[in-house]
């Protein structure tokens, strides 16, 4: 019962049924300001397109990571690698970023601060001088 599958999943033919709940897709579509009237036909097509896209993304991640080895579990890291490697998926970079460890993030912050502080120190000195000049002029 708990044995891994020996064959990859069988492709299902297109049907009039959806796996994603239509009401949830409608709610997500309504959250966009650009969305006008959402007819049942549009809702159905959008849901089917979303399902096909998710299938494509998961299939690409699975194939790239495991090749023809069946029974392996697909993980977040696999999806993020596919998103980061494929130019046509770069719109998902902020939604599916690659995971990094806390110490890596802290190091990135430290480097950004040190690089930013060098630039900011030069700019801040000029701003402070201008502020003190304008304050002395307003006092007179």
From Swiss-Prot:
Indicate, by first and last residue, each region the UniProt record lists as having compositional bias (Acidic residues). 117-140
User: What does the protein in this record do?
Assistant: Histone-like protein which promotes nucleosome sliding of ATP-dependent nucleosome remodeling complexes. Part of the chromatin-accessibility complex (CHRAC) which uses energy/ATP to increase the general accessibility of DNA in chromatin. As a heterodimer with Chrac-14, binds DNA and facilitates nucleosome sliding by Acf. As part of the CHRAC complex, required for oogenesis.
Return the annotated region ranges for Disordered.
Answer: 111-140
Q: What GO biological process terms are annotated to this protein in UniProt? A: chromatin remodeling; DNA-templated DNA replication
Instruction: Please spell out the taxonomic lineage of the organism that makes this protein.
Output: Eukaryota, Metazoa, Ecdysozoa, Arthropoda, Hexapoda
GO molecular function terms listed in the Swiss-Prot or TrEMBL record? molecular adaptor activity; nucleic acid binding; protein heterodimerization activity
> Origin organism of this chain?
Drosophila melanogaster
Answer whether the UniProt record assigns the keyword Nucleus to this protein: yes
Q: Name one GO cellular component term.
A: nucleus
What UniProt keywords apply to this chain's record, in alphabetical order?
Nucleus
State the encoding gene: Chrac-16
Describe, as the record does, how this protein assembles with itself and its partners: Component of the chromatin accessibility complex (CHRAC), composed of Chrac-14, Chrac-16, Acf and Iswi. Forms a heterodimer with Chrac-14. The Chrac-14/Chrac-16 heterodimer interacts with Acf (via N-terminus). Stabilizes the interaction between Chrac-14 and Iswi.
Record-given protein name: Chromatin accessibility complex 16kD protein
Q: Where in the cell is it found?
A: Nucleus
């Amino acid at each position: 019962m708990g044995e891994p599958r020996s064959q990859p999943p069988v492709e299902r033919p297109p049907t009039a049924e959806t796996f994603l709940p239509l009401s949830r897709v409608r709610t997500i579509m309504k959250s966009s300001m650009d969305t006008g009237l959402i007819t049942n036909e549009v809702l159905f097509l959008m849901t089917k397109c979303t399902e096909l896209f998710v299938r494509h993304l998961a299939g690409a991640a699975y194939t790239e990571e495991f090749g023809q080895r069946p029974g392996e579990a697909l993980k977040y890291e696999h999806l993020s690698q596919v998103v980061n490697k494929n130019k046509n998926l770069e719109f998902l970079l902020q939604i599916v970023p690659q995971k990094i460890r806390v110490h890596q993030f802290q190091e990135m912050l430290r480097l950004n601060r040190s690089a930013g502080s060098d630039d900011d120190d030069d700019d801040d000195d000029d701003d402070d001088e201008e502020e003190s000049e304008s304050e002395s002029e307003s006092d007179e």
